């Protein structure tokens, strides 16, 4: 079922017809030449967040903040069209993966093992989020200072992408400054 292709979409090896989703994979490679592997899957917990229209952007797990960062939600796109790669493109240089609205998840990295582990991490993050928010109903999120320290560690460990989760104190995301720490979701003051 695997088809080996070049970055122009030409089949090098394999007898199956490539999926229309190959456009999404190829776009990730073109957007960020450092990416050498892309994993697309439909893991149940992460896909549930994608169907609900919710990104994975809360600072609840130290491992998630350090390892994959926030996982944004790419807007809905019609399968098989250029809308799909266009919806993913804005996240490729700044994040390590994304959810695909009403579809599934996508992870990328400099090698296949790391891309696969990031997909596993996305699903774990989604599953823990479901348990704590839905079943337990109580979440103790990390503070802005704790998130900053984890991001500094992540950067020292060589991971320069991942975004910044929402601030616990005010839930601020996007370009507006947090009323607690003064930073936006990109970590800019």
Provide a role label for each language-model segment.
Residues 1-189:
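Glycine-rich flexible loops
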């Amino acid at each position: 079922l695997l088809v080996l292709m070049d970055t122009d979409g030409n089949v090098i090896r394999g007898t199956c017809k490539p999926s229309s989703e190959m456009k999404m994979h190829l776009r990730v490679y073109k957007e960020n030449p450092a990416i050498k592997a892309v994993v697309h899957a439909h893991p149940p917990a992460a896909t549930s967040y994608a169907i609900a229209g919710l990104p994975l952007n809360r600072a609840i797990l130290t491992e998630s903040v350090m390892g994959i960062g926030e996982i944004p939600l790419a807007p809905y796109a019609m399968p098989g069209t250029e809308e799909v790669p266009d919806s993913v493109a804005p996240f490729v240089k700044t994040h390590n993966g994304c959810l695909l609205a009403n579809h599934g998840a996508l992870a990328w990295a400099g090698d296949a093992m790391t891309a696969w582990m990031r997909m596993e991490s996305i699903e774990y993050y989604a599953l823990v989020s479901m348990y704590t928010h839905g079943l337990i109903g109580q979440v103790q999120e990390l503070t802005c200072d704790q998130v900053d320290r984890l991001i500094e560690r992540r950067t020292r460990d060589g991971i320069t992408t991942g975004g910044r989760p929402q601030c616990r104190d005010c839930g601020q995301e996007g370009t507006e400054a947090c009323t607690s720490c003064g930073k936006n979701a990109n970590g800019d003051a």
